Amino acid sequence: MNKSTLALAVTVGVLAQQAGAAGFLEDSKASISSRTMYYDADMREGASTPANRQRETAEGLKFDYLSGFTQGTVGFGIDAQALVGIHLDGGKGHHPTGNSNSFFPSDGNEAADEWSRLDGNVKARFSKTEAHLGGALAPNLPILIANDSRLLPQTFEGGTITSKEIDNVTFNFGQLEHASGRASSNSTGLSVAGASQDSNKFLYGGADWKVTKDLLLQYYYANLEDFYKQNFLGLVHVYPIAANQSFKTDIRYFDSSSDGKNGDPGFQFNNNNGFAKNPGEVDNKTWSAMFTYTLGGNAFLIGHQRVNDDGGFVFLNQGNLVDSNGNPEGAGGASFYSFTDATVGSFIRAGENTTFGQYSYDFASLGVPGLKASIAYLNGQDIKATNGVGKDLSEHETDARIDYVIQTGALKGFGTTLRHGTYRGNTSTLDQDQTRLIFNYTYSFM
């Protein structure tokens, strides 16, 4: 039993005495979510091996309980989460092992039959400020996004504070110590791509300021001890042109630098398998600008992202961690705050200039609510060769998806998603065709 689960059990016993307090039970929510996913990753280069042709189907079940808060100046509550993954298909020959697989954990050279995880948080509320402490945290911030792009979600252990004491301003602070991968029953420390060592101290703080109803300004600072420091600035503005017509501007800037032991053996950042002015170290500035014109159900997006020449973009990534025996932890799977975090590629190597566009349509405008479709194209150029002197590299990707959620009847809320991505390039990322078919359903008890 990990520390957060033990703390949750103790807290449940304490709060059980107050469970009758107005708000604790009355405001509670409980739900069970089912996600069935077919995942097919077909590498278009190299021999036909499990690592080059992954094809698996699995079922994920997630139970969530969110209590309300007890009465009093300071209210207390608990959150609990249970995750179960069940492997359905994709036997020998279709399941890669080690850190190359982040869809389902391995048992020897095959997929495990099932895996599970239990975690939870304790929480407190004072006025318009909430604190959460535990192992079921799922931040969604510019400097950290919990990944939920496969069967079950990635979660973090630590503490967070969110405060809205000032009108139109939301402050977020936190310290995180461990992460549980999206295909893992255990937790690890925190790290970056390429590093075999980890850190138990990720500090962050920042604010979202709603200047007007149409303008949002953001600033965040993050520090992963012994790896990197990062500053983020963001601006989001929506200009309402007319009814059902608007123009959105989204500008983002990241400035990241080395911290502590970064660059030492075990603490080296692989710069996303690209060039680095100082190999193994973090040294990066990345900006992006996106513009979206919406007219009725149509949305046209165009944007550009620039990664500077000194090194790749950095973010929390536990994919290369190993256990005490030198075996892969299987903690891969990470997200970052960029449109270029695409189905297959990331487009964040040193020197890379990426131009991207997307067209999406909401069929509610045609009387079919719940049906949406989109197609996107990303083209990355000027990627610096790993040795810094060779010919610049390039990559491109086309992504398409269609989503439908049933709006009425016994199956209201049942959702289906079909995604397909085609990636080609001359970088270290293998050419790949990837398909995901996903069925989602959530049933609320309370």
Report the location of each language-model feature:
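Residues that define the transmembrane beta-barrel architecture of outer-membrane proteins
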Residues: R55-E59, E114-L118, P153-E157, S199-L203, ...
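Transmembrane beta-strand segments that form the barrel wall of outer-membrane beta-barrel proteins
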Residues: T36-Y38, A131-A146, F171-E177, G205, ...
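Beta-barrel outer-membrane channel/assembly domains of diderm bacteria
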Residues: K3, A7-A138, S360-A364, A373-A376, ...
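Repeated loop/turn-to-beta-strand initiation elements of outer-membrane beta-barrel proteins
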Residues: T73-G75, K128-H132, N168-N172, S180, ...
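Surface-exposed coil loops of outer-membrane beta-barrel proteins
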Residues: G93-D113, D119, E130-W209, Q218, ...
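Outer-membrane beta-barrel translocator/channel fold
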Residues: N172-V192, N244-T340, L418-L437
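C-terminal structural cap/anchor segments
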Residues: I302-V389, E397-A400
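Solvent-exposed loop/turn segments connecting transmembrane beta-strands
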Residues: F126, A138, L151-P153, A179, ...
